[in-house]
Amino acid sequence: VRQPENDGLRNPSKLYKAARKHEIETMGTDWISRITRKSAWWNPVAPLPPVGGSPELHGIEIEEDDIWEDLGERVGHKVVLGTTRVGKTRLCETMIVQDIRRGDVTIAFDPKGDADLMTRMYVESQKSNRPFYMFHLGFPEYSCRYNPIGDYGRITEVATRIANQLPSEGQSAAFRDFVWRFVNVLTKTMEGLSIKPSYENIYKSAANVDELAGDYFKKILDKHHPGWEKDFDNFDMPESEAKSAVKTGRNLDTMKLGSFLKAKKHNEPLIDALGGILSNDRSYFEKLVSSLYPLLEKLTTGEVAKLISPDTEDLSDPRIIMDWRKVMESNAVVYIGLDSLSDAEVAAAVGNAMFADLTSLAGQIYKFGHGVGQSGKTQKRKVSIHADEFNELIGDEFIPLLNKAGGAGYQVTVYTQTWKDVEAKIGSPAKAGQIGGNLNTMIMLRVKTVETAEMLTNQLPEVKIMTSTLVSRAGDVAFPDSHEDFSSGNEDRIGAETVPMLTPADLTQLPKGQAFALIEGGQLYKIRLPLPKKDKQEEIPAHIGEMAA
């Protein structure tokens, strides 16, 4: 197809080129240009779709068939690769529409906040009579509320979700481990005081750990030593502990309560852990956990703070509070707009915490099934998770989600531009390889880097093609007494040559909306993507329309 003799099949005709040249020279203002630009059956020079690339690969086969994927393959997860503006989000929209219509719990993570995707998900959820949740960091006034650290299977998950957002390279790893222990002690103390973990509550407790510890000490004394107040009034701290309390800058009443508990021979790991924190000089200790405060400051500032640290007792706030268990029980559709263009760090922190929350819930579903804790049996549900630009959201939380959540019915589809983006974000080629090894289906649109293209081409076998070689020869006769003056001959030699089935160049020249796909165990397909048709009678609420404007 790409041989010079086939240029007439690939290149536009002279009449087509003349029409485009006329439009450029006349600025498209005369009546001829208005006719040549019309996309109609009677116009032989109608402009071609602005998809770019080299369409000849798709045109080799003139008979198109619909490509179907076995739904059983979905739990093997899928990756979609393609450079910017070649159709990733529209492909995401198409697959999401199918998942919603099929009845799957459908969750879409959209870091950049695509208005068309959000609108399409709302419309499809209404057509299917399904609940729709919209969480959007860029529009907190319209968004539902969600506490990323409020639900967990084990109390240690809270500290992990927060500490994982901190730097872990070099010496930062030691500080991150220290922050993890500090937050874990705070969280266990809050649980003992029946305080639900949230970013706001964690920040408040971290900034005033003396008060939190004092409240916990009092609760323990009330529970195990009723009437302790009289003994406490007559209790004097050992002189060494009193001097230490003054030196460290800690609250004297809290330090006295801790010393009083010690005198009562009340041993408990959490009390010892709080005592260890309080025994450190306040300013020195705050330096050790200094990396925690900027993160919490960002997560608890402005309108976003009320969004991700919801006050469950505020009855004046009409925005519903979302949690993943409620989403799955109601078979809902969820759009997550993380507004990463405004604040990438907050977007990553919330997105990663959501992935960790989903992974934790997957573990409970895997063990106990859906509807755990409810009367009656709940049917097993499929949960379709779509993560657009997932390289911005990737973290350690994502690896177990891909590794093990398939058994809980999770089927994940991720979208990114290059695989190097994933390696750069997660900071480890080995971990990036773990992620790639759990993505069994691959769809590759136009890409710009050879390394990304080779992720597909290296999985393909080489093929043999027939080659034809024309040989022509002529020569003088070697014997002078021969009656022949010269000899000549012509041959067509047919042979077989081994070549790659596809080269990286084929993938860097794809038109928009076209892709190669490896599905169902590495079967290769060349595909052209459909677009969902818009319904003119779609009713969109005013706030959705305002956000999409």
Language-model regions, residue ranges each:
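Phosphate-binding and hydrolysis-coupling loops of NTP-dependent motor/remodeling domains
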Residues: 2-31, 470, 500-533
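Conserved ATP-driven motor cores of ASCE-family P-loop NTPases powering translocation/secretion/packaging/pilus
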Residues: 152, 402-404, 408-520
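Basic- and hydrophobic-enriched, low-structure N-terminal and domain-boundary segments
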Residues: 1-86, 90-95, 141-143, 396, ...
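P-loop NTPase motor domains
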Residues: 61-63, 69-86, 90-410, 505-526, ...
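N-terminal start-of-chain detector that recognizes signal peptides
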Residues: 50-54, 78-81, 105-107, 304-309, ...
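A residue-identity detector for tryptophan
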Residues: 31, 41-42, 68, 133, ...
